[in-house]
Design a protein with these regions (language model features):
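A glycine-rich beta-to-alpha transition motif near the start of alpha/beta enzyme domains, typified by
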Residues: 1-78, 118-237
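Short strand-coil-strand connectors
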Residues: 64-66, 87, 99-104, 209-211
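C-terminal domain-closing interface element
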Residues: 90-93, 97-112, 117, 223-237
């Protein structure tokens, strides 16, 4: 009811900040359809911003995919810039063509705390993300029985653009943090030049549908010490 965009506040998901015996707090995330058991990267950044507003000053927490920590880099004009440590990525699976979808789909599968399929395309701005994303999410036999979020990626000079169809929301969202991480790791593995590279770390700037985010990681064993950075702002109470 809270997530309903007609009769509630309107949101892609609901997060609960709960007490933890091990860390500063625990984050429980639920999609707008009530499903849970996965990590939400942008939700994690928003949870840290919320925790800070509640007076919490240290941000080690537990989520569905394990331990996370975060830093607030800036807090200006009601917008917090949050840097969140994400799960390491130990495996990437490449597919020349998924079986089942009506459109042939070459891409990569990764788990960044949530299951993601990444597909590189041209003309992303006008791409039918919902139709093709839904087709892959429900019909790709390789991703069954659980399915996966589907990310469409287009490199540009200086970074990548990402649009995501999210399962559980069953629509395109303005930005998906775990999907953006998956897209950046896939971009590196596919030879897409990063925005910067220094001391063994690579960094990608990412244009989502609304915000500019960044992902940096060490490209060892696919991706280690992965961090997601972006804005989080208060909307309603």
């Amino acid at each position: 009811a809270v997530c309903d965009r007609r009769y509630g506040v309107g949101a892609d998901g609901l997060m609960l900040l709960e007490s933890s015996d091990t860390y500063d707090f625990r984050m429980n995330y639920y999609n707008s359809d009530g499903s849970g058991g996965m990590m939400c990267g942008n939700g994690g950044r928003c949870m840290v911003a919320f925790a800070a507003d509640m007076g919490i000053t240290h941000f080690d927490f537990d989520a569905a995919d394990g331990f996370h920590t975060a830093q607030i880099l800036k807090d200006e004009n009601g917008v917090k810039t949050v840097r969140l440590k994400m799960k390491d990525v130990s495996e990437i699976i490449r597919y020349d063509a998924l079986e089942g979808p009506s459109v042939p789909s070459k891409g990569c599968f990764l788990d960044t705390g949530t299951r993601h399929y990444v597909r590189f395309v041209e003309g992303l701005e006008d791409y039918d993300v919902v139709a093709e994303g839904r087709d892959i999410r429900y019909n790709a036999s390789e991703l069954m029985p659980i399915g996966a979020n589907v990310n469409f990626v287009e490199p540009y000079d200086g970074g990548i653009k990402v649009r995501t169809y999210e399962k559980g929301v069953e629509d395109e969202t303005f930005a998906c943090g775990t999907g953006i991480v998956a897209s950046c790791v896939a971009a590196w593995c596919e030879g897409v030049k990063p925005s910067s590279e220094e001391n063994g770390r690579v960094r990608y700037e990412v244009k989502a549908k609304r915000d500019l985010l960044a992902v940096d990681f060490i490209p060892v064993s696919v991706a280690e010490d992965v961090w997601l950075t972006g804005p989080a702002s208060f909307v309603a109470e």
